[in-house]
């Protein structure tokens, strides 16, 4: 039987796990990044150009870490960020990425030429408001591109508790961590992507 979690339950479970085991969030972020890169490899040839979209929170940190791993594996990682990292683990992974020679930049009007895959690491399950402004424009750009998109934990714009969505990133695949998030099974969630746990 498939166990599902609400965003609040997942946050509590993760905090409890870290408190009981002493495993830091940075290690969980690295594990998440490995899973994301495995998914990217199902959609993009080895060594190809991949666009990583990173938000300010830990979802963005997963994206920075995945971009670093893709780069270390010989791929071309292009990173667009929406704001500065707001958590210590995300900041650390952004710094580690720059040490690999990748400089994150603001979102552009056009996708990078030759982009084989896009990673949506903008917002995680905690986002409850609709995407707007630059993020909504970015979703429209990516959705219209025909380039396969891998979502990190949940497609940005999808409510992780209800499955409600107005503007949302349409993913070819969503890599969700630890357990299925209830929003992926409700509302618009089931129509948005193939899901791997």
PLM region spans:
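YjeF_N-associated NAD(P)HX repair module
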Residues: 1-8, 12-13, 17, 115-195
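Nucleotide and nucleotide-moiety/phosphate-recognizing core
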Residues: 37-121, 130-152
């Amino acid at each position: 039987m498939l166990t599902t979690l609400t965003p609040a339950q997942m946050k509590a479970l993760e905090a409890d796990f870290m408190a009981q085991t002493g495993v830091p969030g940075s290690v969980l972020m690295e594990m998440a990044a490995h899973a994301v890169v495995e998914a990217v490899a199902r959609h993009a040839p080895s060594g190809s150009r991949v666009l990583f979209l990173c938000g300010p929170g830990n979802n963005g940190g997963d994206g920075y870490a995945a971009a670093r791993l893709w780069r270390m594996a010989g791929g071309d990682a292009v990173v667009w960020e929406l704001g500065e990292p707001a958590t210590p683990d995300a900041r650390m992974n952004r710094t580690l990425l720059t040490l690999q020679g990748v400089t994150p930049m603001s979102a552009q009007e056009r996708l990078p030429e030759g982009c084989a895959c896009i990673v949506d690491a903008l917002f995680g399950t905690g986002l409850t408001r609709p995407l707007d402004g630059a993020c909504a424009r970015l979703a429209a750009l990516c959705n219209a591109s025909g380039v396969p998109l891998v979502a990190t934990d949940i497609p940005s714009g999808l409510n992780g508790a209800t499955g409600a969505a107005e503007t949302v990133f349409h993913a070819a695949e969503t890599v969700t961590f630890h357990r299925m998030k209830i929003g992926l099974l409700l509302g618009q969630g089931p129509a948005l992507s193939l899901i791997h746990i």
